[in-house]
Structures are given as C-alpha cells and as structure tokens.
C-alpha cells in the first residue's frame, strides 16, 4: 500500500479556538481538515508546516509544540500525519486552496464533517487541550 507522510497545523487563537479548513477539490471535497500537507525531501516537520501554511493560507505561523501522530488507512494509501500546535504570527489569512474555513471552539469541533484521519486528531484535541 502506498505510504504518505504529512504534517498538519493545529492553529489556535487566544480564545483556544482551532482553525479548520474545508476541502474544495477531489474525492473528499467538502470534508473538513487541519491545514498542512506533504513533507518534501530534506525538510523538517516544522519547515514543511511553515511552507504549507504559506502556500495554503498566505500567512506565517510559529510551530509551538508536537501534539500527536495519527496513522490511518484510507482505501488507496496509508497516511501518517504529524500534528503540531501552532500560532499565527500575523492577522491575515487568505484561502488559496480551500473553499471555506472557520475557527471552532472545543465544543464546536463536532459540528463539521472531518476527514477520517482528522477525526482522531479532534479526539486528541478534546482530551488534551483546555
């Protein structure tokens, strides 16, 4: 089975809400996920996260701490997703690749249709984040 390794940014604001994005393309169109993407050869997870967030959201983040790694078997591939708690370094965000986005409080995390791998991250967030 094909293996894909990605990083995901769990971007939090001052109120503890997390930033979620809705896919606008492909088989999983309209499902929600945490922004991020594939690591390139020679990149650290932190470098990959900063690059992906610049590409997807036209903003800068600080990578604050490792949260969890999720392994999930999709029908076509095995996904390994390394998730990091992050903060915005600027106030501007622009959706370059997603059709929608929203800030979700801990209580609102169940209100969107998450991609299967991201469901596991939501469970970790609910249990670990105050």
Question: Where are the regions that the model predicts?
Answer:
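Generic C-terminal helix-cap and adjacent flexible tail
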Residues: 1-2, 126-130
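NUDIX/MutT-family hydrolases
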Residues: 85, 94-125
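Conserved Nudix-box catalytic region and its N-terminal flanking loop in Nudix hydrolases
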Residues: 17-55
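Short secondary-structure junctions
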Residues: 56-63
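Active-site-adjacent beta-strand/loop module that shapes the phosphate/pyrophosphate-binding cleft
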Residues: 13, 60, 70-92, 102
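Hydrophobic packing within well-folded, soluble alpha/beta domains
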Residues: 12, 45-54, 66, 84, ...
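Conserved N-terminal beta-strand and adjoining loop/helix that marks the start
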Residues: 1-18, 38
């Amino acid at each position: 089975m094909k293996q894909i390794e990605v990083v995901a940014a769990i971007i939090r604001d001052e109120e503890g809400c997390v930033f979620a994005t809705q896919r606008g393309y492909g088989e999983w169109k309209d499902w929600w996920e945490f922004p991020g993407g594939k690591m390139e050869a020679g990149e650290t997870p932190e470098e990959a996260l900063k690059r992906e967030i610049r590409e997807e959201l036209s903003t800068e983040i600080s990578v604050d701490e490792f949260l969890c790694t999720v392994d999930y078997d999709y029908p076509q591939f095995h996904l390994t997703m390394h998730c990091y708690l992050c903060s915005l370094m600027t106030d501007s965000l622009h959706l370059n690749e997603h059709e929608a986005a929203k800030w979700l409080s801990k209580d609102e995390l169940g209100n969107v249709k998450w991609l299967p791998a991201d469901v596991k991250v939501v469970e970790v967030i609910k249990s670990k984040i105050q």
